[in-house]
Amino acid sequence: MARQLSSKKPKRLGYTVGRLLGYMGHYKLLFFAVALLVTVSAVANLAGTYMIRPVVNSLDGGTWQEFVSGVVLTACVYGVGVLCALGYTQCMVSVAQKALYDIRRDLFAHLQDLPLVWFDGRNRGDVMSYFTNDVDTIADALNNSFAMVIQSFIQMTGTLIMLFVLNWKLSLIVAVCYAAMFLYIRYSGRRSKAYYNKQQACLGELDGYIEEMVNGQKVVKVFNHEDASIETFVAKNRALQKAGTGAQSYAATMIPAVVSISYVNYAIVAVLGGIMALRGTMDAGSLASYLVFVRQAAAPINQFTQQSNFLLAALAGAERVFEVMDEKPETDEGGTVLVNVEAGADGALRETEHKTGRWAWRAPDGTLTPLRGDVRFESVDFGYEPGHPVLHGISLYAKPGQKIAFVGSTGAGKTTITNLINRFYDVQGGRVVYDGIDVRDIKKESLRRSLGMVLQDTHLFTGTIADNIRFGKLDATQEEIEAAAKIANADSFIRRLPKGYDTMVTSDGANLSQGQRQLLAIARAAVADPPVLILDEATSSVDTRTEALIEKGMDRLMEGRTVFVIAHRLSTVRNANAIMVLEHGEIVERGDHDDLLAQKGLYYKLYNGMFELR
């Protein structure tokens, strides 16, 4: 389900701006250079305008030399402003790109720390939208708008001060016009900000839907779902259009309103200033300088108004990004870790830095417990949502080297049990014990290093065949990779590929068959060499020959390990040490194949095709 965002309270705006400034503040020297150059550029523009006054006055009673020197000096001051503007632009680009790098890095790192339950409620397109749409809007604002808004603010403030210095009476009129402009900008900004927030949320939802439809094109076409998918897309696109129209409508009215007010302001000041000059209460130079200031005042206000629209869009994106980064990460209070061990002269285990292939659990007090693969469920209760239990009082025992199979219809709780072993989720009642240790006391990284998984939906990554197998053990040698491929019965098909183990795999393994992807998944688990395996059986979608290869690979992989199998075909679990039959989150039958058939219960009915097994 796509994530929905409502408009934030005003206090969130200050938090978001402060956090963005914090990222830029990591580069203090560059950030200081930006602030200094922006200030100098704005002051130079103000000073150049003020210097028009003596230049004009020099025409009345002054010398030609005074006039020329005044023009040259004024041009030099403006030149300094231009050079500073070029300088702060380059510095700002550097600061912005460094800050964006940090934001992307921190966002991605935080995503890796979030629990699976966070991803369960979001589609991939919406998650991707944080990195693309939201971060891109931040990039546009930091690269182009941030420094301009600061310069505009300094220039507006400085202009107002200079206007009061030149003539405070006329400046009262200007101040009233300024106030009217800012009141309108504030009103429009607040209204458009809510729409910008909604626009970013709708954009993420639309991206997610597009990704779903692109990935599922075969299903869409098989079921003639094209028209229905277009209708859904149109509805989501219309929601985005509505939010975008609302945001841009308010934003678009700001500049014309500001321009209109500035023209009225200029006309009033020009008339009144001219009257003052005719009466001798204001000299020509002051009037000329004053009118230029008034005219220039419109430029930073227009610029501020225009860039503030981009900033509002960026802040809406930044709020979404920082909301994700503020999500509570996956908790890990375990203190027991997995370490390499070797036997001492007295036969006792001791920790070593060498890769011995022998492992043990090291408790916080230093006690070493051999890694054996002994797994117990003791009266485990669990539910994905409060008040909706999925498992009820699950108790089972898998001795080292045993094969435990789970069978039952869809939704019975088979996959949920395996998710609790590796702590993708934590139990809500009872406990899961691994080698006599509560899994909640084991550091998750160590726990998952001791487990291997072969899932029904095989996920491969862009890279070579070898890289995908090495994903199970990042420091695996080429020899270990090839040995794992042989265990999985994948070596022969890999060597028939044009580049063998160096063949590139496209995203999600689209250039390989379903069976080949499953064989690589088995090889990936084999190279990790874990004592405990979780297998989500998936042989129904491949041909008979490939199915036989997969079964042989599975059998080799399971040798000498504790194995939990989610069975989809009862013919493959006959040799299991124990079969757990689940129904509505409870183990309703248990025993080996022959015992369960003799009971003539649910397993018997499933085996004889009286009920569907999935």
Residue spans of the language-model regions?
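An intracellular "coupling" helix at the cytosolic face of ABC transporter transmembrane type-1 domains
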Residues: H26, L116-V117, V135-L142, F146, ...
